[in-house]
Design a protein with these regions (language model features):
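Ligand/substrate-recognition segments at binding pockets and active sites
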Residues: 361-434
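Detector for C-terminal structural segments
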Residues: 308-338, 388-397, 419-535
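Structural transition elements
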Residues: 325-363, 384-391
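Aromatic- and charge-enriched surface segment that lines or borders ligand/interaction sites
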Residues: 104-146, 295
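N-terminal lobe/hinge region of extracytoplasmic solute-binding protein
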Residues: 56-109, 201-202, 521
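Gly/Pro-rich hinge or "lid" segments in bacterial periplasmic/extracellular proteins
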Residues: 75, 93, 97, 180-230, ...
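Surface-exposed binding/hinge segments that line
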Residues: 107, 115, 149-191
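Ligand-site clamp/hinge motif
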Residues: 194, 223-268, 406
């Protein structure tokens, strides 16, 4: 693939788009170009008659480890899949069940060997066939450069024969097919490489032509798409991290649809000019305790925090009901969910008693407890691009103050850097799709174990490690579900996490948009079905 520099062009495009956003914030357009942009987005056609679509997203940015669309880098696979550039061997359907996507099917030959047959006729957007050899090369590159994927997939070797790929794992990996539906598993043409701006060649309905991190991504129709007609000719994905700016852009017609809209803005769009597509998801808003913090390492403090967060009010009031209260890591709607789990509930008086018994008292009467001369202050690290997280921080700050805990909020786009320093924070509060693969393994392997890449708080449990070994060698689904429930209960008993709520995810679009459908695993957004009717 030709390497691209184009820094001057990228800068000019960035400035032009910034001007468009600023124009959308005012009551009047400052020139005709903004009017033209708004009209084009609203009608879905440009002057050449091509169908165009503009999508605003608060989360497509470096803050969320999505600086490019290269699935072999960090969490960029999400953007690759969401925006229709890449597709995976397997996918999760609307019922959260695993099914083949660019694969035709698979077979477990023995506990260490899997055979995957690919669909005939699938090709990359450059016209090259997506055969077993191409998939093998892609997965080899993935596990060579992506630490999390290498740990998940446990691939020892592979063999390619036409449309049949045989995978040998180094150890038993019952969830291998689920992991191959993970966004990092987007199959790309690695022979084409990655451009300087992070563009790859996939098998999806759209082809990326231009990417400026934290600003925009441009896509065009894949003329070689293997799975039917693609309706939209050109798409622009705009990074609009500020919720108010996103709302103004959709109102003014600068964009056709939006992801990540602030709940406070929803009433603006509850009319016949707009439409919502919504679904309950497993995206959990959670508190992760830092065991390296002397304060949070105190069992009583973690227990009090768990009892000092009012989950019900957070969902009903601050989220306007667009969510549901969590017990464990997974929603009740899945077989390994939270219906039989026991978690601490909001109980300020019990929290006060726990702290009092542990020696945390308010001796100077300032409302904040102290022990051995140290104030009970919690440094709350979170980030703003998920509109719900600053709301959760403010709610917890209020309720925890009532029990004598001071909360210092740091909502920053630099959270990924800060959390690497365990001395810089006490609790990390984020959002994660905990069962986007239709299987429980991924959450534990990523966040909770000694070898986990996102075990930010250095949590360790002998019991959890033993259960994880058992889970990773168990193929029976019923047994796996029960092990996952036991693992969640261990986390709750240790107060290692507080699972606050699950997201009811919505995308809002103009009324003339069709084929934009929210999905429970939050992976699939811009598909070949997307269309827009002229108004």
């Amino acid at each position: 693939m030709k390497k691209r520099t184009g820094k001057i062009l990228a800068l000019l495009l960035s400035l032009t788009m910034m001007a468009g956003v600023m124009a959308g914030c005012g009551s009047e357009k400052t020139d005709g170009s903004a009017d033209s942009t708004s009209t084009q987005a609203a009608t879905g056609a440009d002057t050449t008659g091509k169908k165009t679509f503009v999508f605003g997203d608060t989360t497509f940015n470096a803050e969320n480890e999505e600086s490019t669309i290269d699935p072999h880098s960090a969490y960029c696979g999400w953007a690759c899949m969401r925006y229709g550039v890449g597709e995976t061997l397997m996918k999760i359907n609307d019922s959260m069940k695993l099914e083949p996507w660019i694969a035709e099917g698979y077979e477990l030959v023995d506990n260490l060997t899997w055979k995957i047959t690919l669909k005939d006729g699938v090709c990359f957007s450059n016209g090259k066939p997506c055969d077993a050899e191409a998939v093998k090369k892609c997965l080899e590159d993935l596990i060579a450069v992506h630490e999390r994927a290498a740990g998940d997939l446990k691939i020892a070797s592979m063999e390619a024969d036409g449309l049949v790929l045989t995978i040998h794992t180094a150890e038993e990996c019952p969830s291998l097919m689920n992991y191959l539906s993970e966004p990092y598993g987007c199959i790309i043409d690695v022979d084409e490489g990655v451009t300087d701006d992070g563009i790859v060649v996939g098998t999806g309905p759209y082809v990326a032509t231009e990417l400026v991190t934290d600003d925009h991504l441009k896509l065009v129709k894949n003329e070689n798409y293997w799975d039917g007609n693609v309706n939209i000719d050109e798409i622009t994905v705009r990074t609009i991290s500020d919720g108010d700016t996103l709302a103004l852009a959709l109102q003014s017609g600068e964009i056709n649809a939006a992801y990540g809209m602030a709940y406070a803005s929803y009433p603006i769009f509850e009319n016949d000019k707009f439409q919502f597509t919504s679904v309950q998801t497993s995206r959990s808003f959670y508190v992760q305790m830092n065991y390296a913090s002397p304060v949070v390492a105190d069992d009583a403090v973690r227990e009090a925090i768990a009892m000092g967060i009012d989950k019900e009010s957070f969902v009903k009031v601050l989220l306007n009901g667009y969510g549901y209260v969590a017990t464990g890591a997974f929603p009740d709607t899945v077989a390994f969910g939270g219906s039989t789990l026991h978690a601490k509930t909001y109980d300020p008086e019990a929290a006060k008693a726990v702290l009092e018994e542990a020696g945390w008292t308010d001796s100077d009467g300032d409302g904040i407890r102290e022990k051995d001369g140290q104030k009970l202050t919690i440094r709350w690290l979170t980030y703003p691009s998920r509109q719900e997280l600053p709301l959760l921080a403010e709610a917890a700050q209020s309720t925890l103050k009532e029990i004598g805990i001071e909360v210092q909020i740091n909502a920053t786009a630099d959270h990924n850097t800060i959390c690497k320093d365990p001395a810089a924070w006490d609790v990390y509060v984020g959002a994660n799709v905990n069962c986007g693969l239709g299987d429980p393994t991924n959450f534990f392997s990523t966040h909770c174990l000694d070898a986990s890449t996102k075990n930010r708080g250095q949590y360790h449990s002998d019991e959890l490690e033993e259960l994880a070994v058992k889970l990773n060698s168990t193929f029976d689904v019923t047994e796996r579900n029960q092990i996952a429930i036991e693992m969640q209960q261990q986390l709750l008993d240790d107060d290692a996490f507080v699972f606050c709520s699950f997201l009811k995810m919505s995308m809002i679009s103009q009324a003339n948009v069709t084929g934009l459908t929210a999905h429970a695993c939050d992976y699939y957004e811009l598909t070949a079905d997307l269309d827009i009717n002229e108004v």
